[in-house]
Structure formats: C-alpha cells, structure tokens
Amino acid sequence: LMKDILSEIIANKRFEVDLQKQAISIEQLQEGISEVPTSRSMKQALASSASGIIAEFKRRSPSKGWIKEEACPEEIVPSYAAAGASALSILTDEKFFGGSLKDIRTARPLVEIPILRKDFIIDEYQLYQAKIVGADAVLLIAAALEPEKCNELAEKAHELGLEVLLEIHSSEELIYIDKKIDMVGINNRNLGTFFTDVENSFRLAGQLPQDAVLVSESGISDPEIVNRLRAAGFRGFLIGETFMKTQQPGETLQNFLQAIQ
C-alpha cells in the first residue's frame, strides 16, 4: 500500500512554515506588501482565453522523481507565454517538487500572464509570501484543509488581492465551494496514491455550480482530452509534466495548442 503522500507533505510544510516565521516575521512580510504591483486576474484570463492552458513549471514530483532537475524559469517561463499559455502555475515546494518562491520572483517580470503559486498552503503566512514574490493567485487544496480553515485562507487571499483556485478531487469536497472561490480545480490525481484518472473531471463537472470557472488538473497528456473537457464546461487545463519532460517545454506547448485548434 502506497503511504499517504499528502499527509507527509503537510507535516513537512508545517515544520517549514514555522522555520520561515522564525527567520522573517509575518509583520515583516506585511511591511513588504506595499510596494508589490497589483495582481492580474487569472479567472478573467481563463474565462476569456482561447487556450485556457495553465502551463506548469515544475522540476520534480513525488510520483515521478526528477523530471527536469536543471530547469530554469528564465528560459521556460517566457517560452510558455510566447507559445500561448493563458496562465502559469509555478510549484514552490522545495522538498517534494524541487521548487522555491524564487522561481516566481524570477518569472514575474518576464511575463504578462497571471501566475499561480502552487504549493500546500496551510497558513496565511504563505499568502503574504505569495503576494510579495508577485503571484496573482494561490492554490488551496480541500484535502489538506478543514472547510473553516479553507474559508479563512480564501478570505485572507482576497484581502491581499490574490485569487483562489480551490482544488477538489471528490464530491465530498463540494462543500468547500462558496463565493470566495474564484476557480474550482478538479485534480485527476488522487493525492493519497498519486494515481491519475482524467475521467474524474467528467464525473465531477456536472455537480459543480454553473457559474464556476472550472479547471482540470493533472494527467492531461493529449490535446483531444482538452477538447472533450472544454465541451464538458472546463475553461482551464493545468498541464505540467507533459511539457516539462520534453527538451523544449515551450515548443511542446505550441505543438499541443496547434493540435487543439
């Protein structure tokens, strides 16, 4: 039996955030917020975009190990934007995904499209961090949070001018959706086992509010799946590994988009 990766990641994250708070207090972070430029709307970008592709920058994952250890945001991020990505997702978890907040800081001045901080957010401290490095949106994972905590973090994110992508992977988590949620992501990967099944998006789509901006995450390796998902009401398609495992992720995205048209 594969052990629950999510609980291991969350335990490590609590430890990490505690250490970060010792180094830089939340008050110090709050002071740094004033000079941060205003956010771009990821929700608008997805609702109005032709592609809806949220191209992901990640070096590794718990299920695959290293995908591209030496990957540089300076090269890959602008190539994603040039190829036609609607938004970017940048993994900032170091231990399990090989990323850092520096990756967003580096990427921000290089592109005009919105950036999602993808991490395991459990504390408002991480929302301040996201804002300071230039993220426009944050991921909140239902499986990692109690509904009340999720609600509280979504409210705080909005106070800071960050949009919220709520990630769910089962109908039990539909209770997490309320008006503070800007986008709803359906994760096709079970976070306990990291097994992927795109049909999960189709199963849940019909149970979601009509006005929700829907995003399908993980396991999208084929342009034809994007067409099917779009027909089912999805507006955003989060794709990482399919691009990152190739020599030129931006070029792979470009070809992928041509195949969708």
Where do the protein language model's features map onto the residues?
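Catalytic cores of alpha/beta
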Residues: 122-133, 169-180, 216, 220-239
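An N-cap/entry alpha-helix motif that binds or orients negatively charged groups
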Residues: 3-68
